[in-house]
Amino acid sequence: MNMPRCLLHALTALSIASTLSMTGCDSGPRTLTIGVLVAQTGPSGARGKDLLHGASLAAEEINQGGFMVDGRPLKIQIRATDDKGEVEAAALQARDLIDTGIDAMIGPVNSNQAAAVIPIVAAKGLPQLITATSATLLALGQGNVLRLLANDEQQGRAIASFAAETLHSQRIAIVVEKSDYGRGLDASVVAGLAKMHLAAIASAEIDDKSQLPLETIARFRAEKIDTLVFLAREPQLVGLLDSLEKTGWTDLAVVGTNVIRNRSVAHRPLQIRALYATATAIDAKEFPEGKVFLESFRKRYGGDPVWGAQYAYDAVYALADAARQARSLDASDLVETLKRIDPGTKVNQQMRFAATGEQVYPNIGVYKVDHEAWAMQMMSATW
């Protein structure tokens, strides 16, 4: 039976329109949705906002065009939360972000929150990129957790090496936060010192809301401590420095970690011999390509990063490059590709993930307070 010509034309037009419509869908942008789960308020709020700013800046740059995945433009969507540095809030927000349909996660900031969140994200197999440094965190995942910087076991070795070989410390005391963070670092420092035939003369533990008692400081002074390794956070450090000044004990060096290396600490007048901090988060200006990032960051936010914005910035570029090279936004493809490639990061161009998820080149720096600023003293990936 012959089909009427008008009907044939109508069906042909419909077929062409349908084909064009499908082609249009196939050539439209692909969206990579990244959850940024960080503290934006509370004690870690400044660092969390810093990470969010870095991730958002990278997303804006990528979204301005030119980034393709399997022949289609890639768009980055950032979904941010504020866990306020609270473990329960972090776990709840992780579930909420996953329910909204994210493809990857950056954060949380600190190890306590990360320990609660990692199993939740691992159950979905999503790539999770973290700045939290507790050495045990990656084992809580299922191969999906990737650390953006060195871990605390490596940092502990660096502290021991610096104290023994650079400061030539002979009488060391260690102050340890009562947490997985503090105790993990302590174990690494003690092991590192033992390899150099040294041991701490004295030690003390404090929780995250207490200060080192004056009687403990007096005991350390009586032991003629020359170097105090401080494995706790900024509020406890401020209390320690206040107490040292009140007691008139200033002839010692204090060596802390990432968590004390803040502007507020550097701006404080110091009476002690020296204040150092090891850093797994290296300042952007220390990298050859950091200048370009800093110019963009200042233009966008009106000032310099306060901590590690460049790591979240690079994390977004690493995820985007993994999507491009995998030609996929599938979680397992992203994780596998991130561990296989040299991701196209912008600031730390040595960022490379081992099969374990740790960094292949885990740079650790040592900074010293000098003229109200943290000045780099040395940096190495092998301690």
Tell where the protein language model's regions lie, with residue ranges.
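Extracytosolic ligand-binding ectodomains
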Residues: N2-S18, M22-W383
